[in-house]
Amino acid sequence: MSMAVASLRLLARGGRRRARFPAPLSVPGGRAAFLSGAAEEVAQADAPPPPPPGRKVLESFREEFEIGGRVISFETGKMARFANGSVVISMDDTHVLSTVAAAKSSEPVRDFLPLTVDYQEKQYAQGVIPTTYMRREGAPKERELLCGRIIDRPIRPLFPPGFYHEVQVMNATIIMVNVISSDGKQDPDVMAANASSAALMLSDIPWNGPIGVIRVGRIDGNFVLNPTVDELGLSDLNLVYACSRDKTLMIDVQAREITERDLQAGMKLAHAEAVKCINPQLRLAKRAGKKKKEYKISLISDKSYEKIRTLSEAPIEEVFTDSTYGKFERGEALENITQSVKAKLEEECDEDSLKFLHKAVDTVRKQVIRKRIIEKGLRVDGRQLDEVRPLYCESSTYPILHGSALFSRGDTQVLCTVTLGAPGDAQRLDSIVGPPTKRFMLHYSFPPFSINEVAKRGGLNRREVGHGTLAEKALLAVLPPEGEFPYTVRVNSEVMASDGSTSMASVCGGSMALMDAGIPVREHVAGVSVGLVSEVDQTTGDISSYRILTDILGLEDHLGDMDFKIAGTRRGITAIQLDIKPAGIPLDIICESLEPARKARNQILDRMDQEISSARAFNDGSSPRLATLSFSSDSLRKLLFHRKKIEQETGARVSVSDGTVTIVAKTQPIMDKAIEKVEFLVGREIEVGRTYKGVVSSIKEYGAFVEFNGGQQGLLHISELSHDKVSKVSDVVSVGQVLSLTCIGQDLRGNIKLSLKATLPHAHEKKDLASNHTDPLPSQEVVGWTAVENMPSKDANAEPSISKDEDNMIEETPGCSTPAVIIRSAAECDAQDVTNDPKKKRPKVAKSSPKLSKPASERQEVKRTSAKKTSGASTTAKKNKKEKADSSNDVLDAIPEQNKSNIMNYSSPSNFRSGSMKLGDVVTAKVYQIRAYGLVLELSDGVRGMHKFAENGHKDFEVGEELLVKCSSFNAKGIPVFSLLD
């Protein structure tokens, strides 16, 4: 029996091994196939023993509910069991862990609530290794700070008054990868806020929750609950709403000019759906929650408060009644009152009252200002409840910048600047949801001098990040799409002076700066802050009376109940942020606040339109230039390794993305230089029949290889060099020479075939050029072989001056601003190189083939000088000479009579010889070669002349191009030197 049991155990273990490591052939039924008879006894023996008495068993609790067709669950007891409270919330494949911990000391350590909310998105959540040097998680990102604010703002008002113990809420986003994996559709910020509420409910920390948080979108006029990231891209509303069962706690909105009525409908729907998150938290807290711990509440006694109120109420009311006080004068007067009360308490040695002095005086200030506003409708600066402070707008504050504006509202002043950059300057976002880059940024800065304080500047500040993001959301709705305006835009908002509502002032200043930069925004965006002062019925806890304040001061923000920031255009709202101090405000009051905000916003927009109402011209000197070039993906590979080099050489910014190259430069010359380098490096798609510029890279017996179109090689066969027969390639072209060539196809091997003669006119085309022009020509403008006005010299007696540079023979001719230079032919240049460099071998000149046919002009010259010419040949030569003379006379007859008097020494190309040309003769020549320093010009009868480029002269010539030139001098060999005529 024991052997049978041992065999069964062995087989059972083998079954377990097969279950863990499946083999191609497995026993059907696995281990269950052997559990019969004695096997059942073995199974009972192998079962895990029951836990010893007193040992805790891991137990988890779970609550599920549904919102918008998606199932959401709260789970506790499985993870982070040592924390004061921990909850894992799940929706689809997104899971968020929220933990809560409080300081162990029962004594308060501060006179305010030291609440800290840390939100983290670990890179492992999306299956990515961090890109930092140490491959660890880096400092908190902007998105993490913003999500932390989303959690902090609704839960902070629900802590009991006087609870000043340190509390920390930790949120770590965890996306668990299973066989399906996560698609990253859900933004976890709303889930984290709900999980934090549930964790606080489970903990022993006193907190008057729970809350419900929900996101609402709108697509094609229909509201969507908890939309995905893709749905938010189609939505014109992104509303994050937090509430208790009957009051609103937090609102955060980004919209595309939604109307006040539609926004109210969205908030009412959000409230009804967010309440569904509350009951599951209550059920979970009832099953697994801890008993609330008794903490010592830091509250002043009624006796001490009455004593301080009696000493300070009258002088405080006197200060608030005087509307002539400014921010700092009022603050100094209130501080003097506090010091006076402190001196009296010190005389009486009232230590209990001194301990809560500042808190009690602040409470007295709040009661005085509330009573004055509610009963009399008067504010501390003398304004009416719906009155906006004086406005000041100024655009183009610093014209050298791309865009700048200065905006002031009362004592609040903000300087906004705009900087435009290339698409590659866009901010790269390393978040688990959302787009990978952001092309529009608004950075808000609150320096200490704006409130006349001394402080150290640290890293990212949550307040600065939050205010900058709010203003960025407000302006994003009016920006042109990326296809119309591909620039990266950065707005920098510097607070110069602060007395309330600096974020809304940043919206106004940023809108004017965008227009000043020439960005085609549709219209202005303005923002204003709305406040609330209310009285609460102590018996019911409801608000009995209230007043809505428009454009609140910093003091009214501090002593009031609400800071409701609303930004938008005349069409509707683009951004909203609501922060409150009491434990919730009814939604009806919030909806009522939208109307006074709309009126104030339109008033501010009117003043902004008076300063600048539309975008300025974008082509001024301060605006950068942008060009977009399209290439194939294969061609762009050449640019990836040379992009940085082009940027260093030109100073332009080059961005490569999806077959498109975007170049941004400060000036047009820099832009042209960068485009030239990019096109030369990448090249264009080669088309048969299209003309390209190329550089001769090597010369062979059968032709020349030319580099063109971004480094591509083409063959210029010897038969494509000229319409006439060529015996040697080097007689026509040389290495390094720039040519204009036409693509004529490919050979059997796939090599690109180029042609030079396709760009040159035939002999009969050149002959008939003059006879085709019959229209009268304007003064100083010549087409073809027509003469031009000879520009006289300023000094008729001036002698030609010759440079001391005998090698280059640079000559200057009177009456011509461009210096004329003797430029030798290719053979002469080679001979000169050998003379200058004795080590260089003289190139061997091959004898001409006896079968080489000479040009027609040379053949005519031979016939005129040979004693053996026939009578038929003589007749033909005379006939050709007569036709050329008649064509020149026809051209001269086509010139108006008033211009003929200005023509001097015109020589027809068929009437002159190299020995008969005179200084001042005006002729039409053809570009024969293009050198780095000048042109080799071809005249008739085999005569060639030269022209040198000026230092900054025009160098855009093509081989075969006809130019109008004037003979300015001759060199020692009798070669004519020409200067160009405009």
From Swiss-Prot:
Subcellular location: Mitochondrion
Domain of life: Eukaryota
Domain KH: 624-678
Transit sequence range: 1-39
Gene3D superfamilies per UniProt: GHMP Kinase, N-terminal domain, Nucleic acid-binding proteins
Sequence ranges assigned to domain S1 motif in this UniProt record: 689-757, 920-982
GO annotation, biological process: mitochondrial mRNA catabolic process; mitochondrial RNA 3'-end processing; mRNA processing; rRNA processing; tRNA processing
CDD domains on file: RNase_PH_PNPase_1, RNase_PH_PNPase_2
Enzyme class, broadest EC rank: transferase
Keywords from the UniProt entry: Exonuclease, Hydrolase, Mitochondrion, mRNA processing, Nuclease, Nucleotidyltransferase, Repeat, RNA-binding, rRNA processing, Transferase, Transit peptide, tRNA processing
GO cellular component: cytosol; mitochondrion
Listed GO MF terms: 3'-5'-RNA exonuclease activity; polyribonucleotide nucleotidyltransferase activity; RNA binding
The protein's Enzyme Commission number: 2.7.7.8
Nucleotidyltransferase is among the record's keywords: yes
Residues in coiled coil: none
Keyword NAD listed: no
UniProt cross-references to InterPro entries, sorted A to Z: ExoRNase_PH_dom1, ExoRNase_PH_dom2, ExoRNase_PH_dom2_sf, NA-bd_OB-fold, PNPase, PNPase/RNase_PH_dom_sf, PNPase_PH_RNA-bd_bac/org-type, PNPase_PH_RNA-bd_sf
Comp. bias intervals (Low complexity): 846-855, 868-877
UniProt function note: Involved in the 3'-end maturation of mitochondrial mRNAs, rRNAs and tRNAs. Functions as a poly(A) mRNA 3'-5' degrading phosphorylase.
Family recorded in the similarity comment: Belongs to the polyribonucleotide nucleotidyltransferase family.
Protein name: Polyribonucleotide nucleotidyltransferase 2, mitochondrial
